[in-house]
Amino acid sequence: MSSPETHSDVIELTRELISRPSVTPLDEGCQDLMAKRLAAIGFTIEPMVFEDTTNLWARRGTEGPVFCFAGHTDVVPVGDLNRWHTPPFDPVVIDGYIHGRGAADMKGSLAAMVVAAERFVAEHPDHQGSIAFLITSDEEGPFINGTVRVVETLEARHEKITWALVGEPSSTHLLGDVVKNGRRGSLTGNLTVKGIQGHVAYPHLADNPIHRAAPALAELSRIEWDKGNEFFPPTSFQIANINGGTGASNVIPGELKVMFNFRYSTEVTAETLIARVLGILDAHGLDYDIDWVFNGLPFLTGEGPLLDATREAIFEVTGTHTDPQTTGGTSDGRFIAPTGAQVIELGPVNATIHKVNECVKASDLELLTGCYQRILEKLLCN
């Protein structure tokens, strides 16, 4: 039997969003649906389309400070349909949980943001500052034409975000038990070690790049890059992929390809890590090429208005004392933080994200809506 909360405005909007199969970089009309509701409460709507990516910038108000809800309408592929208990884009509520791709990551958060804004504006039509929405369809993909491009556009016209709340599913066991007040930086290296191909029976006529590289890779894997700090764990170096050889057992390969990644704290910089890696490769006498991919700088939102408001709102709405953390992967917050904005991530429990049978507790979305509205009140109603 359905409970009243499974037919609430936030649940109905969540279901409408899930029903649109917006596998990255598709939006499938999700942003239009959100924009229509935001326009009805006084938001100025500005679509920003860059190549295959649909973005939305919506703002209510012209003065600062600017509170921005940030999120994404794209979802990851569904995987094996046969393993889903229900069709992934035909959302249903079962035993108090709404099922469907994107339920937790992050269409439930998007619905909560919109409904929180509607309720807040109805109660506080003359609020201070501005409320904004920065929504993209390119968060789960290559993140080339999404939030980063919108931020560049805003920066070019000197439009600043003061506080950004990203709706990523931050919670672990209970809604609001964890928020992300920062993220580690991410740096990827694509290394090619050159050798000389030859017959395994005549190693003196070849140069095996696997043998050459192995001591250097072992040294890189043993290094303590830093000790971390009170906000970040120590920097991590991980080899993600390694490939060499022709597939034949009698051929020494001519090159070795290695992909590795750093997740790094604020104790080091990307430039420092690069210099140390190059020093080790050179010390081992390797002939190599290397390309670097900068996936995002580390950022941290310390004590201040946004973190304080978030902590207080979560406790007042849910009774939970939240734990600010910087663990986990990257998010689009990494593109907003360098502008000087304070950034916090708060969203549903993340136990089923990117999995088959993704779901979110319906009552949690009501609580999340309440948290979002309370944060707005604390920051824009002083």
UniProtKB/Swiss-Prot annotation:
Its EC number is 3.5.1.18. Homodimer. It is an enzyme of class 3 (hydrolase). InterPro entries: ArgE/DapE_CS (IPR001261), Bact_exopeptidase_dim_dom (IPR036264), DapE_proteobac (IPR005941), Peptidase_M20 (IPR002933), Peptidase_M20_dimer (IPR011650), Peptidase_M20A (IPR050072). This is Succinyl-diaminopimelate desuccinylase. SUPFAM superfamilies: Bacterial exopeptidase dimerisation domain, Zn-dependent exopeptidases. Zn(2+) 1 binds at H72, D105, E168.
